[in-house]
Amino acid sequence: MRPERTWFPLTGAVTPGAAAGPKPTGPIDPLAGPKQVLAGRVVTMDDALSVRPDGVVYIDRGCVVAVQDRGQPAPAGFEQVKVVLTGGTIYPGLIELHNHLSYNVLPLWSPVPKRFEHRGQWADHKEYRPKISGPMTVIGEHRDAAGEADLVPALVRYVECKCLLGGVTTSQGIMLASNAGIRRYYRGLIRNVEQTDDPALSEAQSRIADVDAEDAQRFLTQLRKEDSCYLLHLSEGVTDPKQPEKSQAREHFCSLEIAPGQWALTNAFCGIHAAGLLPEDFAVLAGRHASMVWSPLSNLLLYGGTARVEAARKEGVRIGLGSDWSPTGSKNLLGELKVAWLYSQHVLNGLFSARDLVAMVTREAASILKWDGLVGRIAAGARADLLVIHGTAGDPYEALIRAREVDIRLVMINGAARYGTSALMGPLAPKDQTVRVGGESRALYLKQQQADPDVAAVSLRTAKTTLREALLDIAKLAKEAEKPKPAPARRALDAPVRPVWSLALDEIPDQGED
């Protein structure tokens, strides 16, 4: 369990009094929404994996009250609520357990210059700084004439909307760091697995750096304290089974063995990538009820191979799915589903069914987070995180995998309709913004009671324009950043500190304490 946090907005001064003040509590949107009724084919992803061909989902105060067939009487209190006919198939919102969201303004690193053996190599390649870390550092630390981090709000708005347009309702967070030594996750539209601000949804930890052998015991102690999961980048690279001792990627997994047969692994452990593990390593994970997140496209582009998910499946290791980041991964989780499907069909002889893969981004991901029953399924008592795609014909699981962004009719989080066609958004949300997807108009509702004011002031259209111009002028912005800045004026010791926020990127050293 984490200590109590203080909420700091992107704007305004931080004073000692404010630092001690209350933070927002409760979910990303208050559980106070109106009664709503959605009709369509309902893919519940419940324990029975039931599908209702002509179903109705009843929602009140952000939660699902009931899921029934159209012919059944409405639950008490819903008799006069108008039924919204979706004309589509209703799924739980997609849950992504691996994504570096801040980087999702960048294009694909194409072609990847060579096949790498482990993650320690590609970050040192000569192309990495000019194409990835350099632009992101400039965007994350850029200051306008007033000294404000003017590109950060645009980036946050853009990458969150990119999630919504792909049906994602839960992902990893965007870490911010301030000049006052404060670190926090951005509180936004989609659920953040590391900072839910919801007592019913326990918060995950995440770590990119490897755990060294001398730290394994301390890591195990930390794992035993977790009430959600610990998302650790694990064994990111490839291993030749004929020469496993030469694999640096697998070496980091072996570092988790504290003593013969004693591992720094529990049911809270979730290994992201796990690409360098051998079949026998998945038996170790399974024996300790650990789980993994599969990111096939990024693995294939960087390493020419991916996790031995067939071994994970054989051993009963629970698997989630993540698109990683846009430089080497899919543009969203909907795209990563397609990569996983193609890999399963053409490399693994159809090992994973379409239903298996849909489970990885719904109920299985929720189980990894210890959020069973609350998200990842459509059932009474679950949060109304929903995704609707066009049409009700054919296999419902293949329909989701084959769906394109233009097929998405509605995305709802905590009962708040956030994105969809005008026909569905009209009766469910106030007018806000529009965006064109595949040549068709879609509606967005991005307003929140507790939004960061800087981000709230940025429309998606403005965010796109701002980021496009910044990336086109990235060399110029980089040179400006290198110019010496005037020393800040002195202030009284008790004067408020004006925080200036930057993106806390993977390559940038820590700038404060959690």
Map each language-model feature to its residues.
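Active-site core of metal-dependent hydrolases
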Residues: 173-327, 345
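Conserved, mostly hydrophobic/aromatic
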Residues: 87, 163, 285, 292, ...
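Short, charged, surface-exposed secondary-structure boundary motifs
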Residues: 301-308, 330-332, 397-399, 421
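The right-handed parallel beta-helix/beta-solenoid scaffold, focusing on the short coil/turn
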Residues: 55, 80-81, 317
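Short beta-alpha connecting loops at secondary-structure transitions
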Residues: 320-325, 342-354, 396-400
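Structural motif of enzymes handling amino- and sulfur-group chemistry
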Residues: 333-341, 361-362
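Active-site metal-binding motif and surrounding structural segment of the metallo-beta-lactamase
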Residues: 71-91, 96
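Active-site microenvironment of metallo-dependent hydrolases
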Residues: 1-77, 99-201, 220-223, 234, ...
